[in-house]
């Protein structure tokens, strides 16, 4: 298309407010005329589109030049990633039905960038994964299903929906006719606790294909299962930078403390992706020297994406260390409560024991005649209770 102004020079709040003043018919006219650039303002107008405007756009959608439809979805995906307040769900759903596969892929990726979790998308993505005529669309749909596997694992989906979703992903991961399609299905299944998944991850990890090894590391990180710690650490020094990068990412997601020293080394890796993955992983694990390293790298950074990642990493470190501190405080309070309860139990036991001992000593000092008098006195006490009028006794 592409957008006319650099994003960093834009006042987002003003754009969002100003965009609502633009007649939607004018936006459609501009889209239809390939000689007119589409202003950034119009992209904000497409956020949270009304049903009426969406219906209007649908009538003209296929008349918009193909190159512009493709470019539009790329731009909307970028905007959705940069501003979480923007929602392009309406136009994303419209583009899912586009006859062009690149537009359909753009639609899926835009909905993913918006973190759209509407449950009806599960069946739509499953249908695309299994039956779309274009392989790239099937691959994109398999990747998009990962967020719903995660929701299923968090018990946010009905059991029957969860089972259907996992069954169909497992079928593709095991029997798909394309290796990348199988890999993306495996990556999405990484969130699942199904019994079949660990074996699939193990098979992918042990294959000589570096692409399958990379996918296995993605699935390991998503599993949250420490059973994979040793395999992940073993790949941190791999000669393939893609594998090193995903191993670093998985180490962070699994919180592998033993990987910290290797991650510090990878933070100096010649490959930028490896370096950034290592820095992010360190922000997840935390510990001595991490904050200093992130702050130093932020001061040195010039690239916008690197600056953004480092700022996010520092925020992430703050969050993780805060959560850790709260957990420690909770453990200390629990331990203190347990110590108090143990001490209280011991005191009560001692008091009971002392009372029993005193009573035994008292009884031992009584001769038989005194003991009989003691019992008679107790009987008189109970007789007193029997003789008292209940109303007088309790008022």
Regions found by a protein language model. Give the residues of each.
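Alpha-helical adaptor scaffolds
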Residues: 210, 214-222, 226-249, 253, ...
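Residue-level signature of alpha-solenoid helical repeat scaffolds
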Residues: 74, 109, 143-147, 187, ...
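Structural signature of alpha-helical solenoid repeat scaffolds
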Residues: 77, 112, 146-150, 190, ...
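Amphipathic alpha-helical scaffolding segments comprising HEAT/armadillo-like alpha-solenoid repeats
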Residues: 9, 13, 18-26, 49-61, ...
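Alpha-helix N-cap/helix-start positions at coil->helix boundaries
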Residues: 36, 66-70, 101-102, 133-136, ...
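Alpha-helical solenoid scaffolds in large eukaryotic transport, assembly, and signaling factors
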Residues: 30-71, 75-91
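DE-rich, low-complexity intrinsically disordered acidic tracts
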Residues: 1-34, 41-45, 80-82, 284, ...
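Alpha-solenoid HEAT/ARM repeat scaffold
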Residues: 40, 70-74, 105-106, 139-143, ...
């Amino acid at each position: 298309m592409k957008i006319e102004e650099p994003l960093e020079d834009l006042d987002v709040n003003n754009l969002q407010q100003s965009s609502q003043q633009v007649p939607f018919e004018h936006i459609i006219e501009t889209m239809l005329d390939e000689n007119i650039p589409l202003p950034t303002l119009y992209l904000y107008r497409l956020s949270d589109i009304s049903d009426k405007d969406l219906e209007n756009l649908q009538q003209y959608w296929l008349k918009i030049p193909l190159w512009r439809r493709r470019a539009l979805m790329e731009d909307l995906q970028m905007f959705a990633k940069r501003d979480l307040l923007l929602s392009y769900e309406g136009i994303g759903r419209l583009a899912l039905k586009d006859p062009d596969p690149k537009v359909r892929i753009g639609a899926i990726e835009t909905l993913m960038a918006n973190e759209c979790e509407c449950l009806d998308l599960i069946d739509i993505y499953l249908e695309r994964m299994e039956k779309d005529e274009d392989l790239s669309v099937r691959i994109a749909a398999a990747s998009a299903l990962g967020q719903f596997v995660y929701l299923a694992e968090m018990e946010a989906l009905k059991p029957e929906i969860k089972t259907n979703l996992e069954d169909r992903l497992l079928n593709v991961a095991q029997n798909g006719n394309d290796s990348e399609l199988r890999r993306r299905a495996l990556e999405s299944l990484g969130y699942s606790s199904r019994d079949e998944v660990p074996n699939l991850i193990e098979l992918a990890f042990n294959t000589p294909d570096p692409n399958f090894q990379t996918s296995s590391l993605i699935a390991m990180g998503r599993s949250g299962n420490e059973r994979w710690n040793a395999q992940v650490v073993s790949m941190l020094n791999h000669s393939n930078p893609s594998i090193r990068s995903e191993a670093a990412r998985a180490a962070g997601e699994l919180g592998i403390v033993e990987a910290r020293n290797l991650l510090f080394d990878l933070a100096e890796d010649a490959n930028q992706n490896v370096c950034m993955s290592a820095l992010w992983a360190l922000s997840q694990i935390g510990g001595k020297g991490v904050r200093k390293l992130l702050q130093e790298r932020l001061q040195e950074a010039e690239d916008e994406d690197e600056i953004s990642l480092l700022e996010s990493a520092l925020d992430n470190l703050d969050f993780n260390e805060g959560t850790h501190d709260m957990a420690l405080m909770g453990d200390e309070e629990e331990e203190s409560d347990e110590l108090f309860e143990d001490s209280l139990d011991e005191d009560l036991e001692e008091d009971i024991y002392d009372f029993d001992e005193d009573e035994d000593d008292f009884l031992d000092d009584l001769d038989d005649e005194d003991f009989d008098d003691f019992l008679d006195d107790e009987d008189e006490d109970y007789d007193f209770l029997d003789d008292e009028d209940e109303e007088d006794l309790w008022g």
